[in-house]
Amino acid sequence: MSLFGTTSGFGTSGTSMFGSATTDNHNPMKDIEVTSSPDDSIGCLSFSPPTLPGNFLIAGSWANDVRCWEVQDSGQTIPKAQQMHTGPVLDVCWSDDGSKVFTASCDKTAKMWDLSSNQAIQIAQHDAPVKTIHWIKAPNYSCVMTGSWDKTLKFWDTRSSNPMMVLQLPERYYCADVIYPMAVVATAGRGLIVYQLENQPSEFRRIESPLKHQHRCVAIFKDKQNKPTGFALGSIEGRVAIHYINPPNPAKDNFTFKCHRSNGTNTSAPQDIYAVNGIAFHPVHGTLATVGSDGRFSFWDKDARTKLKTSEQLDQPISACCFNHNGNIFAYASSYDWSKGHEFYNPQKKNYIFLRNAAEELKPRNKK
């Protein structure tokens, strides 16, 4: 905890390492830079579970690689290992015991990476890129869930090359989240499906989307009893929906809010609207972070319906984010998210992962 509770080591010391004496805005929040960041856009981040001592961070990138760092209490990051796919890596997750990392790729496969032996084996196959991967640990089974643009959701026993179950989706699979016993899947055509995972996965409910534009990211949140109770859904139109599965008062409890838009005070001027690239809930406080194509992160209190903080603007989009298991560290990736197409891609631009002390800034607003 030493550095993640002090200001020493934050400062601007991290910027001079890269030989840039000029002031630039790649790290306006003066956060800690992860060493040896990927060489192309960073699509996903995931911290190790609490079962593992210490903190380990995994990132997947469009350079087809998956990297692992140890994050020390001092804030120093040590590259530990790396694995490759033959296409961009779109998602990563951990097994509950922290011994394995699962990776999903545009090469239409998913792999299981054993960290102790540094061996990776293929565990899943789709007919199109695999968009997300989640580990499910139930009392009577454990499996890996993969979703693909081939319009299927598949569940895999890692010991078998054939899926345990295949569920057809109405459209291409865009994003998902899992907190046992709930899974939420968002598809093209603004489709939303909730699955229950007890005994075996099955469809629970289809939900009319609270958002009018393409779904981009989704994250499940818990109630005071630590049970999954709803989800936050982000779209390409700078908006997030907070949706409870069984709210006492749906019209009052479910709501949407605008975010990741240019702050034009002149209301007659057109507003720039950016995609919400990621949503992460703080594991202790239940507050949430959003990151966007505008190059900012924001922290929110959904219960008080208020914004806690917005960052300064980075010089490129924030493509992914996550919290570590106790919520002390907020990790976010600064890299091109392809939201403006290939003509805006600059291969000379460096990609960064930053670590921020999140213990205080995510505390809920005091209720008056």
Curated annotation (Swiss-Prot):
Kindly report the protein's main subcellular placement as a broad class: cytoplasm
Name the UniProt key words of this record, in alphabetical order.
Answer: Cell cycle, Cell division, Cytoplasm, Cytoskeleton, Mitosis, Nucleus, Phosphoprotein, Repeat, Transport, WD repeat
Recorded hits in InterPro entries, A to Z, give: G-protein_beta_WD-40_rep, WD40/YVTN_repeat-like_dom_sf, WD40_repeat_CS, WD40_repeat_dom_sf, WD40_rpt
GO cellular component terms?
cytoplasm; mitotic spindle pole; nucleus
Stretches forming WD repeats: 37-79, 84-114, 125-157, 168-206, 215-255, 271-301, 310-346
- What PROSITE patterns does the record tag this protein with? WD_REPEATS_1 (PS00678), WD_REPEATS_2 (PS50082), WD_REPEATS_REGION (PS50294)
Lipid metabolism found in the keyword field: no
Quaternary organization: Interacts with NUMA1 (via N-terminal end of the coiled-coil domain); this interaction promotes spindle formation in mitosis. Interacts with NUP98. Interacts with MYCBP2. Interacts with USP11.
- What's the family? Belongs to the WD repeat rae1 family.
Q: Report what the protein is called.
A: mRNA export factor
Q: What organism, scientifically named, is this protein from?
A: Macaca fascicularis (Crab-eating macaque)
Its taxonomic placement starts with:
Eukaryota, Metazoa, Chordata, Craniata, Vertebrata
